[in-house]
Amino acid sequence: MNRDTLKQIMIDQKDIYLNNPLITRQYFLETNVNYCFVGIRRTGKSYMMYQQIKQLEADGIPLSQIIYVNFEDERLLEMTAEDLNLILEIGLEISETDIKPYLFLDEIQNINGWEKFVRRIADMKYRINITGSNSKMLSSEIASTLGGRFVIMNIYPYSFSEYLIANNMTKNYLDVISTKDRADVQNQYNKYVTYGDTEEDKQEIAAIDHI
């Protein structure tokens, strides 16, 4: 993997989590824990990472100390496990500090042999979060694969209450009493069961509504 190409990809991808609108999910997360976010595609695993990054930023961690790589990027198709350490090297170069950066590796299962890398980085006391959605990542064996170094967090599609919050309806839908509010909730429920209940589905619905 060409080092300069990888560095450019990392810089490009920073805009993804900086500019993506964030809807906080109803999961309790700690910033001093290594997480492995698993779940079917389109349930918002990446957004859990964005949520973690926003919390670190709120806690005063400079963005230069945050490394985010999404391995769905087609420019990374030829990347191998041997190249993964370049991510850490480039991250340390960008941060211009000896302080260990936080790593967020999205859909890392796309790289064969990724397991040894993340175990080694965790053993070196880096804070690292990963996501995955293939059959191996979703299996009960993932905990043993990661050797107890990560908390496995299963991410599920939106509940209906989360879906309402994502669509700017902050009222408790169980307490809705006016005719208009009932109609609004029914309209959202129809979309929820028709189009889907994931973060990406919510964005697609918003796009449809603006057509």
Predicted regions located by residue number:
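Interdomain motor-coupling "hinge/lid" segment immediately C-terminal to the ATP-binding subdomain
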Residues: N2-K14, E141-I211
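Conserved lysine of the Walker
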Residues: K45-S46
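Structural recognition of the conserved hydrophobic beta-strand(s) that form the central parallel beta-sheet
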Residues: R127-S133, N154, Y163
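Walker A (P-loop) phosphate-binding loop of P-loop NTPases
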Residues: R41-R42
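Short glycine-rich substrate-engagement loop in P-loop NTPases that contacts/grips substrate
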Residues: I67-P101
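Pre-Walker A adenine-sensing motif
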Residues: Q13-N32
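Hydrophobic anchor at the beta1->P-loop junction of P-loop NTPases
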Residues: F37
